[in-house]
Amino acid sequence: MIDNGSMFIAIEGIDGSGKTTLAGDIASYTGFYLTREPTDRFCYDYIEADYNDESSIINFFLFTLDRYMHQKEIKNHLINGVISDRYVFSSIAYQGSGMEKRFKNMDETISWMLDVSRFIIMPDLIIYLKIDPGIALKRLNLRKNEKKNTDAFERLEMLKNVSKYYDYIFSGIIKIPVIKINAEMEYNYVKDEAIKGLNDYL
């Protein structure tokens, strides 16, 4: 928590875990400023769609640039508290799992990505929505505006790799409190657990 008592909270989890809905509800509950990543200024023109090491490195730097530009917005609202729908650990989980073959192991991958991100503001608290990738993919396929992926198996494997990274990151290797919630439960349960956990830090 920063000196004046305000708080910066990041909500993390794989696609389909319910981050955006929860971020909005937590912002309403706390009165905190709601933001998200990628930001509205993010340029998708250079994003690489392939899930491989080279594309993941390119995408990581694009998202990191957006995040550094996001810092001013976050700083301007910290005094009243900030909620972010995705933040740095989304990049580490998504792009890290794709670029891992460039490094010795997961630890070295994460260490390098955190070093590149060392000047950004880190959150005071993380809410991690844990969900089985297969269930998350079913949810995504039910969304009317969700682009249907022709290779469901490939996307499922990607979500499994990302989930593995999230689980490892939030297993205790970072010195940030993490509220872990079973996002496979009914949404009201997820919301209540998030608020209950959050109240211990407010």
UniProtKB/Swiss-Prot annotation:
GO molecular function, one term: ATP binding
PROSITE patterns in the cross-refs: THYMIDYLATE_KINASE
Residues reported to bind ATP: G13, I14, D15, G16, S17, G18, K19, T20
Matches recorded under InterPro entries: P-loop_NTPase (IPR027417), Thymidylate_kin-like_dom (IPR039430), Thymidylate_kin_CS (IPR018095), Thymidylate_kinase (IPR018094)
Top EC group: transferase
Keywords: ATP-binding, Kinase, Nucleotide biosynthesis, Nucleotide-binding, Transferase
Family designation: Belongs to the thymidylate kinase family.
PANTHER family: THYMIDYLATE KINASE (PTHR10344), UMP-CMP KINASE 2, MITOCHONDRIAL (PTHR10344:SF4)
Name listed for the protein in its UniProt record: Probable thymidylate kinase
